[in-house]
């Protein structure tokens, strides 16, 4: 039944595809600063263009996302190859055709998982072809690549797993929202899942404060969201999980014991008259107090 349902959605998407003539181009820019004991340890920047094509028929909404140009840079430079590889895989994952919930606007199905998986398999084959097992250290490199690709392969095992992976990424997390389906926006508080940058995308439940206003400079509707959180609210399992990752990954070189986990999240969206975002700005501060800190700034700008 699952495959019949997927084929049904794919056929519908194909029938509607010829009506996708209203593509909107966005430029996404992300900056990440890592500090250890107050000292900057790394600084990275990624830039990417995404082309979004919306379509709806009655209460069914589809969105097609295509990737344009992508750039990455990082300091120290010896981390560039790893960043470029992650960026390349993110570009593959981002080329998604999705349906969204007609009431809430979040992604409820990825319609082209097979096509995305095929792109990943081609990318993976190219990576293996670059390794010569007979060369000095070639077998070690081969084994390391096996471990890496096994992790990535797991993201594509089925549609729910890939959808969870996709919606954990900032663009798909903050872009797909109630305004895409014309839902009413109002001042309120609600629960949402925050995916940790420091701790392997560990899901953490938090309360979001939302305010709706009019932007003074542009006159556009403005949606503002804010989270301030400390580890007093972490449930025991999540706190234990976070502490274990800290102990295994960070403490060997930081030395200091785990103190207190905090994060702050700021998210402003300007909505154009057609209901699509004109500009989205996200700021995230996440830390283990006094020991390690990550600062993320992310902007999505609609291009002319």
Which residues are covered by each model-predicted region?
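Signature of exported/secreted
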Residues: 1-273, 277-304
